[in-house]
Amino acid sequence: MVRRLTSPRLEFEAAAIYEYPEHLRSFLNDLPTRPGVYLFHGESDTMPLYIGKSVNIRSRVLSHLRTPDEAAMLRQSRRISWICTAGEIGALLLEARLIKEQQPLFNKRLRRNRQLCALQLNEKRVDVVYAKEVDFSRAPNLFGLFANRRAALQALQTIADEQKLCYGLLGLEPLSRGRACFRSALKRCAGACCGKESHEEHALRLRQSLERLRVVCWPWQGAVALKEQHPEMTQYHIIQNWLWLGAVNSLEEATTLIRTPAGFDHDGYKILCKPLLSGNYEITELDPANDQRAS
C-alpha cells in the first residue's frame, strides 16, 4: 500500500481555511501567492479594518489567526481584497500610503509627523532642525530622524555619554567660559571644555559617532524610476527626493506622476534608501525633456 505524504504547506492551508470564520472562506480560494497588499473590510466602504503586505499574500492572510486581536478583526470583517505588486518594495510603499490615507482601525497609525527633526552638524556645533523648515532630502550634514526634539537630544546625550563628549560644547547644558564642566571632574567628559582635549579632536569624535546616523542626501537631480520585476508583472516606481510618487507599468507613463514633493517622507526614506543605493535594481533618471538614462 502506497502512503501519500501531504506537504506541510498544504496541511497548514487546509487547517487555516477550516479555522477561518465561515463568512470569509469564500474569499480565501482566490488569494494570490504573489507580493502585494491585502485589505480586510468591515461594514464601512471607506475605512478598512486592517491593511497588510506580504511577498505572498495568500500565506500571510491565512496566518491571521494567531492573537485575540486578529480573531476580533476577523469577526468584524465582511470581505477581503488585495492589490498585487511586482515585489516587496512596491508592497511596502503601497501599504504605507494606504494606511496613511485610510487610517484602518487595527493598524498602527502612520501620520505625517510635523515634529520630525534631525541633528545638523555645523562645524563644531549641533542643532536640532525640523523637516517643516529644512529640506531633509537636500540639506547636508543631517544625522538621525527623530519624532521630536526631545528624542533628538536624548540621542545626542547617549552619544556624548558613550564617547565622553562635553555636554556644554554640545549645547546640552550651560558651560562657563574657561571652566571645566561637572562631568569632566567625574571623568565622564574627556576635557575639551578645559583644554585636556582639543576642540578639533572633540569635533572629530562627534562626527565619527554621528556618521552611522547620517541622512543621505537625494543623489539625483530630479526624479528616478526604480524597476521591480515579477514573472507576471513589471513596475517602475517613480521617486523624487525619497518620496514615492507612485508606480507605472512603463517608463512612457512616468511623466504622468512627476511632480515636486510637498515635503520629506520619513517612511519613503526608510523603505527606499537601501534599495536605491544598493546597485541591485535598474534605476532610470527621468529627465524633464524625456532624456531617460538607465544606470
UniProtKB/Swiss-Prot annotation:
Keywords: DNA damage, DNA excision, DNA repair, Excision nuclease, Hydrolase, SOS response. Incises the DNA at the 3' side of a lesion during nucleotide excision repair. Incises the DNA farther away from the lesion than UvrC. Not able to incise the 5' site of a lesion. In vitro, the incision activity of Cho is UvrA and UvrB dependent. When a lesion remains because UvrC is not able to induce the 3' incision, Cho incises the DNA. Then UvrC makes the 5' incision. The combined action of Cho and UvrC broadens the substrate range of nucleotide excision repair. It comes from Escherichia coli (strain K12). GO terms for molecular function: DNA endonuclease activity. The gene is cho. This is Excinuclease cho. GO terms for cellular component: excinuclease repair complex. Residues 33-108 form the GIY-YIG domain. The keyword Hydrolase applies. The keyword DNA damage applies. GO terms for biological process: DNA damage response; nucleotide-excision repair; SOS response. Transmembrane segments: none annotated. Coiled coil: none annotated. It comes from the Bacteria. The lineage of its organism: Bacteria, Pseudomonadati, Pseudomonadota, Gammaproteobacteria, Enterobacterales.
